[in-house]
Amino acid sequence: MRKIRTGDEVIVIAGKDKGRRGRVSRVIPEKDRVIVDNVNMVKRHTRGNPMQGTTGGIIEKEAPIHISNVAIYNPETEKADRVGVRQEGDRKVRYFKSNQQLIDA
């Protein structure tokens, strides 16, 4: 079970965007990376293609961040938190390690 999933609110704990929060828009498990909305923005220079009707220029988009550089945000403590996984009944659930509160309630 993945500890960070699409839709989770995370906080960046290392790198140039340290301290910024955002929602995970995509998880790339084979590379252990996540894409967070409006965090780690990079500029891409694109060439226009008149056959497809696209214009060239400089576009800004989110670049992936390694999953070890983000931590899930706990709204109750308003800090970054660690995630645990435990069995409840017949399914696994994620919980915050600091206060044992369920994430997937």
From Swiss-Prot:
Disulfide bonds: none annotated. One of its GO terms (molecular function) is rRNA binding. Keywords: Ribonucleoprotein, Ribosomal protein, RNA-binding, rRNA-binding. It comes from the Bacteria. GO terms for biological process: translation. The keyword rRNA-binding applies. InterPro entries: KOW, Rib_uL2_dom2, Ribosomal_uL24, Ribosomal_uL24_CS, Ribosomal_uL24_KOW, Translation_prot_SH3-like_sf. CDD domains: KOW_RPL26. One of its GO terms (cellular component) is ribosome. Belongs to the universal ribosomal protein uL24 family. One of two assembly initiator proteins, it binds directly to the 5'-end of the 23S rRNA, where it nucleates assembly of the 50S subunit. One of the proteins that surrounds the polypeptide exit tunnel on the outside of the subunit. Part of the 50S ribosomal subunit. This is Large ribosomal subunit protein uL24. It comes from Halorhodospira halophila (strain DSM 244 / SL1). The lineage of its organism: Bacteria, Pseudomonadati, Pseudomonadota, Gammaproteobacteria, Chromatiales.
